[in-house]
Amino acid sequence: MAKAVHSMVRVLNENRSIDFYKKAFGLEVADRLDFGDFLLIYLRNAETPFEVELTVNHAQKVPYTLGDGYGHLAVTVEGVDAEHARMEGEGLAPGALRDFKHDGKTLARFFFIADPDGYKIEVIERGGRFV
């Protein structure tokens, strides 16, 4: 059986991205591998072994084109309202809180936030199918 271990995003500014993921999700640098032309930085927290891999290509000087195929990464939290307020307090500009409904039933409460390079992250209230 396959096990998801990380999701990689290409970033322009190492420090700006590390700061965002630490403030937003409590992710810390677990490993940093410098290959000369590029750098891999693995971020994680105590909640899960799943990591966000930041790739810094040193020759890249302009923002990446994100395209229209990629959607988002999703994380769950215990209290989505409190997390939304905390992120606002950190100056991270989370999007509006929304309810995800199907057949008149609320399946989840969530919001989106974008990292410094524009990658969207969905923050979902933990519960139901989103544990």
PLM features: what roles do these ranges have?
Residues 1-18, 70-75, 124-131:
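N-terminal beta-strand motif that seeds the catalytic metal site of vicinal oxygen chelate
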Residues 2, 8-51:
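Core segments of cupin and vicinal oxygen chelate
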Residues 20, 80-86:
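Short amphipathic alpha-helices within nucleic acid-binding modules
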Residues 37, 69, 107:
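Exposed loop/turn and edge beta-strand positions of beta-sandwich/beta-sheet ligand-binding modules
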Residues 46-50, 59-61, 78-82:
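Short, charged/polar surface micro-motifs in flexible loops or helix N-caps
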Residues 75, 84-131:
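Vicinal oxygen chelate
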